């Protein structure tokens, strides 16, 4: 009789499992994305923030790990350890891109080429793609601002820049270098500038560096020097 009872219990459990409702697949859509800055305290890391709206159609909390959900940003894949409450919910997903693990991805992200971003998972052996898009945040060149005889470089980017190069004026070249804070400015320091060159037009030949990631050259011109009255 014991084997019969065991078989009966197993059959009952099997029927209950078959009747139990399966979890419905959640939905997700990307609302916005931004580069949030550059960490340098523990080595350079570019911070990417993604604002995502999730929808859990089930009447119970749903762990995304159930679907093996992961966020892919170029060559980087980040497993999502989130539990969604029933209904809709917004989350900001942060991704750290370091030169050691994601140099190519970070460089592509800061170029016009951009990088592919996708939220993926799987259920019952089937691949799931919640969303897939391409993000690009090209490096913006600094802007020159004049205040009297002083000139300032404004950095419109959300990360700091190391700037070095030359001011070419009236056939002469003067060394320029500075560190620009994120979305900040710095006074243009010209090494070797001499009186008598205050009036004229020239150009700035600069190399911009995102510390730890890449360097980019550009020329800003015409560059006018106008003495104060």
Model-derived features with residue positions:
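Short, hydrophobic/aromatic beta-strand segments
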Residues: 60-68, 160-166
């Amino acid at each position: 009789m014991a084997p019969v009872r065991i078989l009966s219990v197993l059959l009952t459990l099997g029927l209950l499992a078959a009747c139990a409702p399966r979890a419905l697949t959640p939905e997700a859509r990307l609302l916005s994305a931004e580069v949030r800055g550059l960490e340098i305290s523990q080595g350079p890391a570019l911070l990417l923030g993604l604002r995502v709206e999730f929808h859990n159609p089930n009447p119970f909390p749903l762990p995304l790990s159930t679907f093996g959900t992961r966020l892919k940003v170029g060559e980087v894949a980040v497993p999502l350890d989130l539990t969604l409450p029933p209904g809709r919910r917004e989350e900001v997903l942060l991704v750290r891109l370091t030169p050691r693990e994601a140099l190519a991805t970070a460089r592509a992200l800061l170029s016009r080429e951009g990088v592919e971003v996708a939220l993926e998972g799987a259920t019952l052996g089937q691949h799931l793609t919640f969303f897939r898009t391409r993000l690009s945040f090209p490096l913006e060149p600094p802007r020159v601002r004049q205040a009297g005889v002083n000139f300032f470089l404004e950095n419109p980017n959300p990360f700091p820049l190391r700037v070095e190069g030359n001011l070419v004026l009236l056939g002469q070249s003067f060394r320029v270098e500075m560190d620009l804070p994120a979305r900040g400015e710095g006074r243009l320091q010209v090494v070797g500038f001499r009186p008598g060159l205050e009036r004229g037009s020239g150009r700035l030949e600069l190399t911009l560096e995102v510390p730890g990631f890449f360097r980019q050259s550009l020329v800003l011109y015409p560059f006018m020097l106008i003495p104060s009255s």
